[in-house]
Amino acid sequence: PDLDEVYELDLDPANPDRYLFDGTTIPIRYESITRPYRIGSTDDSLVSETQRVAVTPLGPVVYRNANKLYIVRAGPDGEYRAGSQFLAMMRARSLAEWKGALATRARATSNLTYADRAGNILTIWMGTVPRLPTRSGGDSMPIPARGSADVWTRLIALDSLPQTLNPRGGYVHNENDAPHFANLNALLDTARYPDNVERGELRLRSQHALQLIGGKDKLSLEDVLVRKHSMRMLLADRVKRDLITALKQSSPAPAVAQALAVLERWDNTVAPASRGGLLFETWWRRYQSL
């Protein structure tokens, strides 16, 4: 997620230690920060270095030139209550209490999943995501800021973050992908969310999970546990046949022919004793690097 924005401010032509904002001139504040650090891995002694940093009420200065000042304004900047928030979440005894703990907004980013004995299930894409007054500059474009109307001042509301509550089918899931496919019966529309919210992406691990739980089977807890530990490699299901065909057509050398035989016997799982799984994974990583 895009949790910060880089803003471009105009330096005061009359004083390079001030910048122009909201029609007035504001001083840049300078702080000296001393950081201890260890040199090497065997010596326990510490050395320290003091740096002078420039900061503004909008955020720290990350770059400047003769005319411009660049600052980064980050959603999680200065937040220290993540541990307290997690403790409150663990102590919650209802969905309302749990969401009340989330309202602290101390966790920079997390995919969170909830279930309770009342039958509620929820997954929420959680983040300290700014509510931007302009289109996001992403990671490559600073946004010109001449006054307060140009910079973000609050986070996107908790209830406006991508989330799925009690969907048809009785499940939610997340494998650290975007939240748009938490349930195939309740897909989230990317267009509903600002452009600094994560885009929908469904990688192989999530696709595999949906194959396991997204059907019409009625699953017991034991069934869920068995499927949770599936060793299936979905990528192999999709490309192994073509790989084998290409190898056979290449007049393989003896070593390659032996590897081909291993792949042909392989059951497309990555169980601990699966030689084919290790071989296929090694090939795929090298293939990706070409």
Where are these regions (language model features)?
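Structured, charged N-terminal subsegments at the starts of enzyme catalytic cores
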Residues: P1, T269-L290
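Mature extracytoplasmic enzyme cores
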Residues: P1-V256, V262-P272
